[in-house]
Amino acid sequence: MKEHIFNKFIDNILKHTGLSREDFFSKSQNGEIVLARQTLFYLCSKRGLTTAMIKQYMENNECHLTRPPITYGVSIVEGLLKEDSDLQNVIDKLSIVD
C-alpha cells in the first residue's frame, strides 16, 4: 500500500517538473533532478514511509542509494520550506494522492 503512495508522489513530481522517469531515477547530479528526488523523500517521510522503505522503493526502480542521502534530502526540503513560502503551495499540490 505504501508503495502506491511512493509511486503517486513520483507521478505528481514528474508531471510538475517535466522530468522523465528515466532521468529521475538516473545517477544524475543535476540540481533540478536532485531537488525532485529530495522532494520525493520529504513527501514520503511526511506520509509515514520510513527511510528503509524509501530506499527499497528506489532500489525497485534501479536507483541504489544509501540512507544518508534520503535523510539529507528531507532536511534540505525542510530548510527550503522555512525560506520559501511558495514552496509550501507546491508541496501541498504534490502531496495529493488519489
Task: Give, region by region, the residue ranges found by the protein language model.
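N-terminal alpha-helical segment
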Residues: 6, 34-37, 70
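Short, amphipathic alpha-helical "recognition" segments used to contact nucleic acids or chromatin
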Residues: 33-49
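DNA major-groove recognition helix of helix-turn-helix
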Residues: 45, 70-81
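General nucleic-acid-binding
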Residues: 1-11, 94
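Short, basic interhelical loop/turn and adjoining N-cap
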Residues: 50-52, 56-72
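Short Lys/Arg-enriched helix C-cap and helix-to-coil transition segments
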Residues: 79-98
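Short, Lys/Arg-enriched anionic-surface-contact patches
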Residues: 12-37, 65
